[in-house]
From Swiss-Prot:
Disulfide bonds join C158-C234. One of its GO terms (biological process) is adenylate cyclase-activating serotonin receptor signaling pathway. Serotonin binds at D165. Specificity for G(s) G alpha proteins is determined by the length of transmembrane regions 5 and 6 (TM5 and TM6). It comes from the Eukaryota. A lipid is attached at C404 (S-palmitoyl cysteine). G-protein coupled receptor for 5-hydroxytryptamine (serotonin), a biogenic hormone that functions as a neurotransmitter, a hormone and a mitogen. Ligand binding causes a conformation change that triggers signaling via guanine nucleotide-binding proteins (G proteins) and modulates the activity of downstream effectors. HTR7 is coupled to G(s) G alpha proteins and mediates activation of adenylate cyclase activity. Gene3D superfamilies: Rhodopsin 7-helix transmembrane proteins. GO terms for cellular component: plasma membrane; synapse. InterPro entries: 5HT_7_rcpt, GPCR_Rhodpsn, GPCR_Rhodpsn_7TM. Belongs to the G-protein coupled receptor 1 family. This is 5-hydroxytryptamine receptor 7.
Length: 448
């Protein structure tokens, strides 16, 4: 049987020594029967041994146990002090800004009278979902990332953390979907939908969103698909069926609905833009010019002025509808675009991971997973600022709250609303021209 050295490898050189050296000694004894062979062997032995390289014991490679910086399911990263400071500062800033922005939304809608409208209840639900992500999820992910990806909060809290993460993020995404439907119905059914858009209807929609979000959270807690959880890793279940179900309900279906709603609003805005074209003043009929009686001629002119006045009123109404549709299309387009950019990479990765890595762990590089995850969390940061940018009342309320001017908020909003109404009431130049002509015609008719 071949010898094995201390490193666990076959000792080839030792085996050769055991075969060659006795044979050399026996031949030397045959050549020197007078007993001088022993001295010859002794003198030549060091030279014979020197022809074979010395084998030193080396530690056997550890094939079963990974090194300290790698876990059995996913890698870990050892950051330097500077890297920890930079990463920690960025993650802390994202978390604090998310908390501040969504708190402003909740405070604004709840405490400002003008903003307490049923249509804004969905925005409050969205802000609460994003605020929950910032308070209950982001801090633990930040700590895990700063220590290199190792989960240190225990087995039980791993399940609680995953449940909170999935439910809050899903509620945020599905609320965005419901908001897009609400905006679409408000644009396409301006007469019937506002009547149904009361507080009770909004409460039912919000409750449905959170219950559906919980339906994705509960299966791993009741044994359908177990989360991946050991001493170092906390990962949502990688079961194939659960992965397809959760990603479809939480992202792919809401994204499809949002894209469809945006397309419908965009199409309505294009259709309204095609209709919104001033057709010009109607031509004066020959009988109104060539008339046997001047009174009949003036009467024709007065009727034409009245028709033009009604036409311009209808045009101003079309302008208002057109602007509202354009604003809704722009706002929803930016919301859908930001949502897709933030969450699409994460859900593509989450869907493909079980089919690439199997159901027991993740083989995706840690920095790729964390980058996609925090990109999705960033959607909770930008939502309040998107709505504030396109909503004048929210923007004014934000400014007043940040300046600690709490008592004057309702007064400022009322003044701003009055100013906006006066701007809309101003007539364009063509309207003034027609009214002046109508007044002139009326005076001439009265004089006649």
């Amino acid at each position: 049987m071949m010898d094995v050295n201390s490193s666990g490898r076959p000792d080839l050189y030792g085996h050769l020594r055991s075969l060659i050296l006795p044979e050399v000694g026996r031949r030397l004894q045959d050549l020197s029967p007078d007993g001088g062979a022993h001295s010859v062997v002794s003198s030549w032995m060091p030279h014979l041994l020197s022809g074979f390289p010395e084998v030193t014991a080396s530690p056997a490679p550890t094939w079963d146990a990974p090194p300290d910086n790698v876990s059995g399911c996913g890698e870990q990263i050892n950051y330097g002090r500077v890297e920890k400071v930079v990463i920690g500062s960025i993650l802390t800033l994202i978390t604090l800004l998310t908390i501040a922005g969504n708190c402003l939304v909740v405070i604004s809608v709840c405490f400002v009278k003008k903003l307490r409208q049923p249509s804004n209840y969905l925005i409050v639900s969205l802000a609460l979902a994003d605020l929950s992500v910032a308070v209950a999820v982001m801090p633990f992910v930040s700590v895990t990332d700063l220590i290199g990806g190792k989960w240190i909060f225990g087995h039980f809290f791993c399940n609680v953390f995953i449940a909170m993460d999935v439910m809050c993020c899903t509620a945020s995404i599905m609320t965005l979907c419901v908001i897009s439907i609400d905006r679409y119905l408000g644009i396409t059914r301006p007469l019937t939908y506002p009547v149904r858009q009361n507080g009770k209807c909004m409460a039912k929609m919000i409750l449905s969103v959170w219950l559906l979000s919980a339906s994705i959270t509960l299966p791993p807690l009741f044994g359908w698909a177990q989360n991946v959880n050991d001493d170092k890793v906390c990962l949502i279940s990688q079961d194939f069926g659960y992965t397809i179900y959760s990603t479809a309900v939480a992202f792919y279906i809401p994204m499809s609905v949002m894209l469809f709603m945006y397309y419908q609003i965009y199409k309505a805005a294009r259709k309204s833009a095609a209709k919104h074209k001033f057709s010009g003043f109607p031509r004066v009929q020959p009988e109104s010019v060539i008339s046997l009686n001047g009174v009949v001629k003036l009467q024709k002119e007065v009727e034409e002025c009245a028709n033009l006045s009604r036409l311009l009123k209808h045009e101003r109404k079309n302008i208002s509808i057109f602007k509202r549709e354009q604003k809704a299309a722009t706002t929803l387009g930016i919301i859908v675009g930001a949502f897709t950019v933030c969450w699409l990479p994460f859900f593509l990765l989450s869907t493909a991971r079980p089919f690439i890595c199997g159901t027991s762990c993740s083989c995706i590089p840690l920095w790729v997973e964390r980058t996609c995850l925090w990109l999705g969390y960033a959607n909770s940061l930008i939502n309040p600022f998107i709505y504030a940018f396109f909503n004048r009342d929210l923007r004014t309320t934000y400014r007043s709250l940040l300046q600690c001017q709490y008592r004057n908020i309702n007064r400022k909003l009322s003044a701003a609303g009055m100013h906006e109404a006066l701007k809309l009431a101003e007539r364009p130049e063509r309207s003034e021209f027609v009214l002046q002509n109508c007044d002139h015609c009326g005076k001439k008719g009265h004089d006649t």
